[in-house]
Amino acid sequence: MPYKIIRNDITKMHVECIVNTANPYPVIGDGCDSAIYHAAGSSELLAYRNTLGEFEECDVFLTPGFALDCQYILHVVSPYYEGEQTNALVHQCYQNAFQIIEENNIKSVAFPLISTGS
């Protein structure tokens, strides 16, 4: 899959799927998570997210895009930075995300930087 590096508001990207740096709990976090929830329609996305429960670090899951101009939101539960071991976890997040992308035949994706803080 070819790629481009674009600096833009991820909620305004015209792609099939955007990736969210998700909270492990069904709450709206800061940064990218907050921006995506608000652009998608906070109440609808949060209600859907509540049905899924809690997740662990490196878990990934798809939700509908709701009011966003994308079909899917791929939520990646990114780790908190805790030194060198975090590098392997971030790598695992990207691997898990690309596995879901491939399994769902998603052709265009916008990624934020994962585990960089809000």
Language model regions located:
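Macrodomain-like recognition of ADP-ribose-binding/processing modules
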Residues: 1-118
